[in-house]
Amino acid sequence: MALVGAGRRPARCVMVLGTSSGAGKSWLCTALCRWYARQGLRVAPFKAQNMSNNARVVAGGEIGSAQYFQALAAGVEPTVQMNPLLLKPEADTRSQVVLLGRVNAELTALPWRTRCAQVWPLLAQTLDALRREYDVIVIEGAGSPAEINLQSSDVVNLRVARHADAACLLVSDIDRGG
């Protein structure tokens, strides 16, 4: 039985980071997915962790709406691997954790920093698996990578960029101060 992507080099990665939430990362990632697909490349979106109550049901569970539409723009079937960690806010200090499409009550109960340490290996493995299957991965960051208080438990911005050796683009919204 042959492994998918066996003998291929891992996909190139481009990562879109932003100066803030709402800067336009999702829109740019969607456009990049479409552009790469039109170049004849097999492209997939990836966002390690998304915090949103806007989710779409796909085979295997649910993912953030942005990654769902990015996959459609890329011309591929959306999968739970494209958004392996979805946090659905339930209250000011509590979020339901959806891991690879399914609610994970054990992770939901853990403190945020503990949860991040436990999920990072799975997030990295999921990205690596996508890199074996596609030519290009368009990675979306979250919020701003400059939030110093979050860097020690980062599983979505610079840690992902380093892991993937991704070329990074920085998006800014001038209406929000650049």
Question: Language-model segments: what does each one mean?
Answer:
Residues 2-178:
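Flexible phosphate-sensing "switch/lid" loops adjacent to ATP/NTP-binding sites
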